Amino acid sequence: MAPKKAKRRAAGGEGSSNVFSMFEQSQIQEYKEAFTIIDQNRDGIISKDDLRDVLASMGQLNVKNEELEAMIKEASGPINFTVFLTMFGEKLKGADPEDVIVSAFKVLDPEGTGSIKKEFLEELLTTQCDRFTAEEMKNLWAAFPPDVAGNVDYKNICYVITHGEEKEE
């Protein structure tokens, strides 16, 4: 009888139900979609190779192995969806909404430039999660036009989302 108990406990994961209770069902679905985007090889675990591939797809081709290892080491073990959700839950406890949104964008900006490519942001917003319409994209670019190099200042977008107006320069 004991092996069944141990097996069930291992499969269920201690405390895993707690992390799911921290989020609304819609938030869990959004995190699942983000996890699926990052899990490039679809094996249910985010690896260094998955991170390298997703960053390369965003134009970040020169990410060092040490940087990838540091990202992976933030977890206590293999990063499955429950661990991924737990990591976000821990980071979001008591966090300022603007910081939370900026942190989400920073995942797409490993070099810390404060901006991301317009084409990449548009692709994400029109193909993932709650897809933006052409009209919504037009309105976004009217409100937050990219610079001459095609970069979008995501920190300004985050400020407006959380404060409702642009910062005074």
UniProtKB/Swiss-Prot annotation:
GO terms for biological process: actin-myosin filament sliding; muscle contraction; muscle tissue morphogenesis; skeletal muscle tissue development. It comes from the Eukaryota. Disruption phenotype: Reduced trunk contractile force and complete pectoral fin paralysis. Muscle weakness is most pronounced in an appendicular muscle and is explained by reduced myosin activity and fiber degeneration. Residues 26-61, 96-131, 132-167 form the EF-hand domain. InterPro entries: EF-hand-dom_pair, EF_Hand_1_Ca_BS, EF_hand_dom, Myosin_RLC. Keywords: Calcium, Metal-binding, Motor protein, Muscle protein, Myosin, Phosphoprotein, Repeat. Myosin is a hexamer of 2 heavy chains and 4 light chains. Interacts with nanos3; the interaction negatively regulates mylpfa phosphorylation. This is Myosin regulatory light chain 2, skeletal muscle isoform A. The keyword Repeat applies. Ca(2+) binds at residues 39, 41, 43, 50. Gene3D superfamilies: EF-hand (1.10.238.10). It comes from Danio rerio. One of its GO terms (molecular function) is calcium ion binding. Myosin regulatory subunit that plays a role to maintain muscle integrity during early development. Plays a role in muscle contraction. SMART domains: EFh (SM00054). Signal peptide: none annotated. One of its GO terms (cellular component) is cytoplasm. The modification Phosphoserine is found at residue 21. CDD domains: EFh.
